[in-house]
Amino acid sequence: MKKKFPAISLSIACVAFLLLLVAVFGKDRMSPDMFKSMFAGFFAEKLTTEQLKEDYVYAIEDEGSKKIKILIAPGHNESSPGAAFLNLREVDMTSELGEEIFGLFKNDDHYEAVLLRGKNGDHPDFTEYFNRERENIARVRDRKRAQMKNYISDGLIRKEEPIPHVTVPEETSLRLYGINMWADEIGASIVLNLHFNDYPRKRINLPGEYSGFSIYIPYDEYGNARVSEAIAEKVLSRLLKYYFVSTYPKEGIGIIPDWELISLGANDTLKAASLLIEYGYIYEPQFKYSQTRKVLMRDMALKTYLGVQDFFGGTSTALSDTAILPYLWDEDISQGDEGKVSVLALQAALASAGFYPPLGKTRDDCPLTGVFKECTRSALASFQENV
């Protein structure tokens, strides 16, 4: 019974503090953000949606104000290359996608974009920081882990069963905690972690059972949870225009709170808003061909950028909502074609017009692939019948 007393005392203290705020400020003078933050989680809210949006406004109105610093973190590196399928490697795909996303934010005056890992390896400033602070990173990680175990055993934090993840090696763990600490060190407000999913199977040279994208966010007890969720909702909405959420049942809600993923700030180790986006399963057909994959990467990057912009309310009407269209068809296409950008553009155009996927099919049945099979034939026939 004694282990429950701290939690009860904490709850009484929170209620008393809330009543004091209402008494001092009056309910009408308190913003919704102030009320919500009282119940945001066990850990103090480190960055609110209101604060982040105010920073964006200042970045627009005052040239001397700091820009929104956003860290683009392509998942994995050569020492830990991540998922693989046939000739595809996750480390290469996230690097390509990272370059696309980085370019969009870099060209927007409201942001200061930082790319953690590019074609030539890690950002030199991160490499210097990691080598210099290596021992301190390990100490902070171990201390935070121990604190979390104590909070859980004392009943102060509710622990939910997590989605199974691959256990990372010691060196990878240290690197990921180091990225979190460096993100806070450089004053990043948003961290976008880029990944491609995989699912265990006996025949690794064949596609797996599941497909679709998912967005992981910090567990709701963490101090960066609420602002991360607000951004994730906007990115999800953008991606849903052409893509579909994961068919893996535990990812089917699209946005999944997770308390174990280090990149999101496991053990409350990150101040910045953080999203870990699995843009699809590496064995999905749309990633097979380099030409169509490159266009899809640009489109996914654009939708990610626009989603973040939607959060701030700053989306430009001059920007198209897709990198696939408009497209000039200058070649014949026919059923059986594979890996053609012209087919991908046709699928996207049919999707925009409401004909793809065809009636009776889902986006899981008929993803945008650049492959002309029955899905495309049926959708095109339906379009021709209705125009």
Locations of regions flagged by a protein language model:
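Catalytic-site microenvironment of enzymes
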Residues: M1-N386
